[in-house]
A protein has these predicted regions:
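Short, compositionally biased leader-like segments
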Residues: 1-30
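Short, basic/aromatic recognition patches
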Residues: 38-42
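A short catalytic or substrate-binding loop motif that flags glycine-/basic-rich loops and adjacent residues
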Residues: 45-49
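Short beta-strand scaffold segments in enzyme catalytic cores
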Residues: 51-57, 120-121
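Short HxH-centered metal-ligating active-site micro-motif
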Residues: 65-114
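Short beta-alpha junction loops
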Residues: 97, 122-129
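Acidic, Ser/Thr-rich peripheral helices and adjacent loops at domain boundaries
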Residues: 141-153
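Conserved small/polar residues in nucleotide/adenosyl-binding loops
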Residues: 157-161
Length: 161
């Protein structure tokens, strides 16, 4: 079902319709997120001053869109069954309206608990969104206690459509 979850209070219908239209966007294989989609998310994030989260499947299909507050977003549970050491097949892409691209402790917890393929943040820098910085974390293995080990990478590449 194509719906927007989360904190929709005070959000214009035109903005909600822009977000619903994102369900039609296909992220190319081999990309965490396309530059065009990242720029669109940055634009909407700046306009509403709230975090936005997308779930994207391995095939590039957007499966969930959630609006949060200005410093957090509630993430829905990832559907499907998987083994104890298997990832979900979903990457979570979300925005930080304050421009900080660094993954928070909450982001790393969500990465581990939901077994995301990746947790991606876009530190939105306005008014020139091409200056926004993207970082991402991934589960890179298991430790001796079979707990997930995460690693973060920050991309200083500027967004260009």
């Amino acid at each position: 079902m194509r719906e927007i979850l989360g904190n929709k209070k005070g959000i214009r219908d035109s903005v909600l319709n822009e977000l619903i239209a994102l369900y039609d966007v296909q992220v190319p294989l081999g990309q965490l997120i396309s530059a065009e989609l990242a720029l669109k998310l940055a634009d909407i994030t700046e306009f509403i001053n709230r975090e936005i989260s997308l779930y994207i499947s391995r095939s590039g299909q957007i499966t969930n869109i959630v609006i949060g507050g200005n410093d957090s977003v509630e993430l829905p549970a990832v559907e499907g069954r998987r083994g104890i050491g298997r990832l979900s097949g979903i990457r979570c892409v979300h925005t930080h309206p304050n421009g900080n691209p660094v993954l928070s402790g909450v982001d790393f917890s969500a990465l581990k608990n939901n077994k995301f393929d990746a947790m991606v943040t876009i530190g939105v820098t306005a008014p020139d969104y091409t200056q926004s910085i993207i970082s991402f974390g991934m589960i890179v293995g298991l430790d001796k206690e079979e707990q997930f080990i995460c690693d973060e990478s920050v991309s200083y590449t500027h967004l260009r459509a």
